[in-house]
Amino acid sequence: MKNPIIFIIPLLALAGCSGGDAPLYKDPAQPAEKRAEDLTSRMTLEQKVAQMCQWVGLEHMKSAEKELTEEELHNNTARGFYPGITTADVEQMTRDGKIGSFLHVLTAEEANYLQRLASQSPLQIPLLIGIDAIHGNAQVAGCTVYPTSIGQASTFDPELVERICEETAAEMRAPGS
């Protein structure tokens, strides 16, 4: 071999192209406690507070935007709307990692869209998606609505209440909650 440098330079260049090690918090092989410590050590106070902020889903906001007047959109919190904040603002806040959770996300498509937005955030923390379903998934058309918790308790039938909970859970999983 006359000039070994011809082979060494490309190898060094390829070695320099590696993306580097992923942060510890993204390594599922690591213990949860270490991952949590690593993630929180990288977070600013604003990012930590944002993880505790829960907003209503975009489709819920869009329906309010259609039905409320311009004045109502900017001056009150009717239907869980945020005065002066549009769905586009919420989308950007999600991309920026300033929202940690959504409530009233009614479809798997919406949940997936929101998770894609969160994956663009600096730390790529997945969102927590929730919905109030204390007596069935009443927010989604076609789902079963059961009596409230006190009504269920008054049956004195724990097996019935357990079946209600199982059916509610199945109906909740369908749209991605």
Place the predicted regions along the sequence by residue.
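Short, intrinsically disordered, low-complexity terminal segments
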Residues: 10-12, 98
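N-terminal beta-rich core of secreted/periplasmic extracellular enzymes
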Residues: 21-177
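Generic cytosolic/nucleocytoplasmic N-terminal low-complexity/intrinsically disordered segments
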Residues: 1-2, 47
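Sec-dependent signal peptide recognition
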Residues: 2-10
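C-terminal motif of bacterial Sec signal peptides marking the signal peptidase cleavage site
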Residues: 15-16
